[in-house]
């Protein structure tokens, strides 16, 4: 199975260790993983600010880079949701449709495609709060949101249960947005910060040592809020935990 690895802009710039952990984790399962070196943005910032047509060049490059792979995998529900649902600034050829359909977020790829049953190398003896990032939760179906009042499931929590020593703590409002929202945090900084403070306070109240999520952007926002509040929480991407990160 030939995998194309897409690394989001903010991971490449601020948390390259998340991209490395994703690569290493996929290779643990015997997959052939390649990183196209001329990859850039998925186009989400332009789409989110109402300048969707300006994303055409980045969309075309994305398709060019990844059309030859069996699957495209990225450690970001936000970027994958953009590709699946909003990569529409370019003509929808069969090639474009195929790339959109085979683009997966890391957790769903491990859970739904590889159907991982065990992670024998993974051990993380800590109390963990899991943050369900909005686009992964409601956009690509990571889990069933509690507001639907239907039987619950969670792909990331199913995977975290396979990590030795890891204990998941219960949050008061587990599905609530952290306030980042990409450009939302720029246009509505006060609201964004307040939402982040509420999230961090809930995590601390639950007794978490670490906060785990499948999206680095949410983690970076919450980490900043925790530092501003003086709350000693630590934040780590799920790719690192599943890959056997030593805390």
Regions found by a protein language model. Name each.
Residues 1-247:
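Iron-sulfur cluster-binding electron-transfer modules in prokaryotic oxidoreductases
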